Curated annotation (Swiss-Prot):
Residues 980-1004 are annotated as: Disordered. One of its GO terms (biological process) is long-term memory. Residues 1-39 form the signal peptide. One of its GO terms (cellular component) is NMDA selective glutamate receptor complex. NMDA receptor subtype of glutamate-gated ion channels with high calcium permeability and voltage-dependent sensitivity to magnesium. Mediated by glycine. This protein plays a key role in synaptic plasticity, synaptogenesis, excitotoxicity, memory acquisition and learning. It mediates neuronal functions in glutamate neurotransmission. Is involved in the cell surface targeting of NMDA receptors. Plays a role in associative learning and in long-term memory consolidation. It comes from Drosophila pseudoobscura pseudoobscura. The keyword Repeat does not apply. This is Glutamate [NMDA] receptor subunit 1. Keywords: Calcium, Cell membrane, Disulfide bond, Glycoprotein, Ion channel, Ion transport, Ligand-gated ion channel, Magnesium, Membrane, Phosphoprotein, Postsynaptic cell membrane, Receptor, Signal, Synapse, Transmembrane, Transmembrane helix, Transport.
Length: 1004
């Protein structure tokens, strides 16, 4: 088998070595080797005192140096503990991998090597190093390569214990990213072979770029990936696709032979001349036809075997020293034929090796998880005339920052076409597709009539393309942004086709489920979607610059600085029925009312108890004014307050008059203050806004009667999503959001929407145009409007510089005055604000109603007085009738008494003269009260008021006689008198001494 040198046999052996050991390792090792366990407690005496280090080297010189380094290592106490000695065991690398395997078993493993250092000549291929890795890895013996750079050695499923002090070829992708960031290139084309290393470098570039660009401002994107089969014969087909791409920066990984074919064909297509940039890997740099101006990379110390041998030995010694101090090291395996060997210490040693980080002869030596060298330095090579290689930069380790750093001297670079100036790296198109959107006053859109064939001079055609049937509706656009676009095209020299946003939206980020897709995918809609998907080159519209959009597109410097504000309708003047009461608060009105009556009461008391008041003056003239009563005092207090004339009822005492003067002064101040404030409230006052700004409590804690909204998917909508403190407000307003700003503004005018939150430029324009609208509070969320371009667009810097020049020249200020701030309209609004209101019925209706209430109150009171007076008159009339009846009855009684007295006198006279009647007889008219039973027998009499309820006085009708006649007198005999009842049951009659003249009880 030693004579198997043909390429076919070598490839066969390589495949066998590639797959067979992998299968064996994959199937047997999980069954025979337990997982790595933690080291147990040990002592220094448990570890071996001698360690054999194997070497599979490419030449005798390397073997000699390896022996020397091991000898010197034993005297370095920094790396070698006491009582520990290292010995070297070396063999020569054979081109035959099978022979190499046997040599490793017989000459290295049989001598208990703890690790193997392997190198080979670059021209011999990687079959022999792979054989060493397979064999040693099977027994968990670490292998340190110093020259193998293929990507296959990074696969730890196959090369389980392989490390290397050189980086793999595909690590050059890291240097590519640094170079692109340095030159600020944003679009690239990657050319790579379809082998393992070619695909590895592409994957490394794509993976690393995702995290690399988080720390830098300029992001490079891959516009085109060109993959070719090795052993090229022609590259023309791929060059055609590359020529139509926009990028002119080519990153190439290819072997030296393939690079020659690519450079040959690219030169024929004039793609290696001025304006093109080629950045290639180490192998391509050695092509014999590399064009002038090509940039390439070359690994530092790539061919310094001695340096790598020394670094690998010291890395190994450092790992063994730390392992000795931490755990017990078992002896290395000795029998290559024993497949059951499980050297756990070898696996642990491999982990210690990967964690090393030392400063070696080839630079900073450290490893990643795959055992590949990191912190490797590169030279940046510039190909000059006659294939001369000139170092123009270095990619080296910065010990202060503990990271790699790129340093390139741009002035020393000669670019393709022998140019000293860095190419743009991109083909700059001069005819652009520009999109805009209707948004007053920045863009006014007018549909063309059927008979119109062109727009007005200040307008530009802006068709609206239908996404479903690709038809276009013809429109004309003008406004702030259209004038800006016209001036930009003149200044930086490009032509354009203008069109409207297909869906009429600025665009927002949506999760969409594409047909047949299993997962959701985020996509931009509207203007943003057109630009991100490269269906447009530029957006000239009031497009707010925010982080969400800046992640996917480029923005120029702002052409208009603005913020977010709130638009609301001005509250109408409150012309209520009690408008005249507005100058004073309710509390003050109550105090004034109370003061009037308190002062009136005090005036009355002062005048009542003063010794100089009319109540105390006994000799006062009867012609003088009457004393001040309480009613007059109240009248006086009200009269002074209302400034009416006081004709009567003024206080007389000095103390009361002093109080009256003070009250008059108080009334003067109150009336003057009321008059002044009434004018301010009814004439000069302008209503304020309902909201104080975004921090208004009514917005933060939205009530049912307060509605606020913005445009869904807009930059304002994104702003509210970002602000945590506005989350409650956003959840409330999200359901009210509108599709367009125009709809929301119309609803504000109609009163359907209380607050519309939008860009300040648009809302200030609306407020200046309509005096009924006003912006509330200060600006918040300050940002700006910018021109949107594709990521990496070559026009970004030119547009930015042009906009800055426009600001300096005053052109932007001119656009502001022309389109946003309508001076005459705003002046009219200010004049309207300052003009006093003419008082109308609405303003003073309350006063008239107050007068009406007074009149109605007076009428009501007079009706009550009339009714009361009628009642009093009726009562008085009844009293008069009763009094008249009583007087008449009294007269009758007196008359009867007189008659009876005269009759008694006559009877006495007759008795005395004639003695006709027997003694003891009296007139019943006189003694009837003493003999009621006699009266009862004589017949019933009338009942008189004043008699007891149970006693009836009887009076015989004939007793009174006829009118004009004297009553008849009945003479009672002693027998009749003897049948009388006891005296106690008799009540006195009206004419008895108990009689009273009060007749009020007679009134019914």
């Amino acid at each position: 088998m030693a004579g198997t040198d043909s390429p076919a046999a070598a490839r066969f052996v390589y495949r066998c070595l590639l797959f067979a050991p992998a299968i064996v390792v994959g199937l047997l090792l999980p069954l025979t080797l337990p997982p790595i366990a933690a080291a147990q407690r040990h002592t220094a005496s448990d570890n071996p005192s001698t360690y054999n280090i194997g070497g599979v080297l490419s030449n005798s010189e390397s073997e000699t140096y390896f022996h020397t380094i091991i000898s010197h290592l034993n005297f370095d106490q920094q790396y070698v503990p006491r009582k520990v000695t290292y010995y070297d065991k070396t063999i020569r690398m054979d081109k035959n991998p099978i022979k190499t395997v046997f040599n490793v078993c017989d000459k290295l493993i049989e001598n208990r090597v703890y690790a193997v250092v392997v190198s080979h000549e670059q021209t011999s291929g990687d079959l022999s190093p792979a054989a060493v890795s397979y064999t040693s890895g099977f027994y968990s013996i670490p292998v340190i390569g110093i020259s193998s750079r293929d990507a296959a050695f990074s696969d730890k499923n196959i090369h389980v214990s392989f490390l290397r002090t050189v980086p793999p070829y595909y690590h050059q992708a890291d240097v590519w990213l640094e170079m692109l960031s340095h030159f600020a290139y944003t679009k690239v084309i990657i050319i790579h072979s379809s082998d393992t290393d070619g695909r590895a470098i592409l994957g490394r570039f794509q993976t690393t770029s995702q995290t690399y660009y988080d720390d830098v401002d300029v992001r490079a994107t891959v516009e085109l990936i060109v993959e070719f089969e090795p052993k090229l014969e022609s590259f023309t087909e791929h060059l055609i696709d590359m020529k139509t791409a926009q990028s002119r920066v080519y990153l190439m990984y290819a072997s030296t032979e393939d690079a020659q074919v690519i450079f040959r064909d690219a030169g024929e297509y004039n793609m290696t001349g001025e304006g093109h940039v080629w950045i290639v890997t180490e192998q391509a740099l050695f092509a014999n036809n590399t064009p002038d101006g090509v940039l390439g990379l070359q690994l530092e110390h790539a061919h310094s075997d001695k340096g790598h041998i020394r670094d690998s030995v010291y890395v190994l010694a450092s790992a063994i020293k730390e392992m000795i101090s931490n755990e017990t090291i078992a002896e290395a395996p000795k029998d290559c034929g024993d497949s059951a060997v499980n050297w756990e210490s070898g696996k642990r040693l491999f982990q210690y090796l990967k964690s090393r980080n030392i400063t070696g002869e080839t630079g900073q030596v450290a490893f990643d998880d795959n055992g590949d060298r990191i912190y490797a330095g590169y030279d940046v090579i510039n190909i000059r005339e006659h294939q001369k290689k000139h170092v123009v930069g270095k990619f080296s380790y910065d010990s202060m920052r503990a990271k790699m750093r790129m340093n390139i001297n741009d002035s020393e670079i000669i670019w393709p076409g022998k140019q000293n100036r860095k190419p743009e790296g991109i083909m700059i198109p001069t005819h652009l597709k520009v999109l805009t959107i209707e948004e007053k006053p920045f863009v006014y859109v007018r549909r063309m009539g059927d008979d119109e064939f062109r727009c007005e001079p200040d307008e530009r055609p802006c068709p609206l393309f239908n996404a479903t049937d690709s038809t276009a509706n013809e429109y004309c656009c003008r406004g702030y942004c259209i004038d800006l676009l016209i001036e930009l095209s003149k200044r930086i020299n490009f032509t354009y086709d203008l069109a409207l946003s297909p869906d009429g939206q600025f665009g927002h980020y949506l999760l969409r489920n594409n047909t047949g897709a299993m997962t959701l995918r985020k996509e931009w809609t509207g203007l943003m979607g057109e630009l991100v998907n490269e269906r447009a080159d530029m957006i000239v519209a009031p497009l707010t610059i925010n982080p969400e959009r800046a992640e996917y597109i480029e923005f120029s410097k702002p052409f208009k600085y603005q913020g977010i504000t709130i638009l609301e309708k001005k509250p109408s003047r409150s012309s209520t029925l009690v408008s005249f009461l507005q100058p004073f608060s309710n509390t003050l009105w109550i105090l004034v009312m109370v003061s009037v009556h308190v002062v009136a009461l005090v005036l009355y008391l002062l005048d009542r108890f003063s010794p100089f008041g009319r109540f105390k003056l006994s000799h006062s003239d009867s012609n003088e004014e009457k004393a001040l009563n309480l009613s007059s005092a109240v009248w006086f207090a009200w009269g002074v307050l209302l400034n009416s004339g006081i004709g009567e009822g003024t206080p007389r005492s000095f103390s009361a008059r002093v109080l009256g003067m003070v009250w008059a002064g108080f009334a003067m101040i109150i009336v003057a203050s009321y008059t002044a404030n009434l004018a301010a409230f009814l004439v000069l006052e302008r209503p304020k806004t309902k909201l104080s700004g975004i921090n208004d409590a009514r917005l933060r804690n939205t009530m049912e009667n307060l509605t606020c909204a913005t445009v869904k998917g807009s930059s304002v909508d994104m702003y509210f999503r970002r602000q945590v403190e506005l989350s409650n407000m956003y959840r409330t307003m999200e359901a009210n959001n509108y599709a367009t700003a125009e709809q929301a503004i119309q609803d504000v005018k109609k009163g359907k929407l209380m607050a519309f939150i939008w860009d300040s430029s648009r809302l200030e324009y609306e407020a200046s145009k309509d005096c009924e609208l006003v912006t509330a509070g200060e600006l918040f969320g300050r940002s700006g409007y910018g021109v949107g371009l594709q990521k990496g667009s070559p026009w970004t810097d030119s547009v930015t510089l042009a906009i800055l020049e426009f600001h300096e020249s005053g052109f932007m200020e001119k656009l502001d005055k022309q389109w946003i701030f309508h001076g005459h309209v705003q002046q009219n609004c200010e004049l309207f604000e300052k003009t006093p209101n003419t008082l109308g019925l609405k303003n003073m209706a309350g006063v008239f109603i107050l007068v009406g209430v007074g009149i109605a109150g007076g009428v009501g009171l007079i009706i009550i007085e009339v009714i009361y007076k009628k009642h009093q008159v009726k009562k008085q009339k009844r009293l008069d009738i009763a009094r008249h009846a009583a007087d008449k009855w009294r007269g009758t009684i007196e008359k009867r008494k007189t008659i009876r007295a005269s009759l008694a006198m006559q009877r006495q006279y007759n008795v005395g003269l004639n003695s006709t009647h027997p003694p003891g007889t009296i007139s019943l008219a006189v003694d009837k009260r003493r003999y009621p039973r006699l009266g009862q027998r004589l017949g019933p009499e009338r009942a008189w008021p004043g008699d007891a309820a149970d006693v009836l006085r009887t009076r015989r009708p004939y007793e009174l006689g006829k009118p004009g006649q004297s009553p008849k007198v009945m003479v009672a005999t002693p027998a009749m008198l003897g049948r009388t009842r006891p005296q106690q049951n008799i009540l006195p009659p009206r004419y008895s001494p108990g009689y009273t003249s009060d007749v009020s009880h007679l009134v019914v």
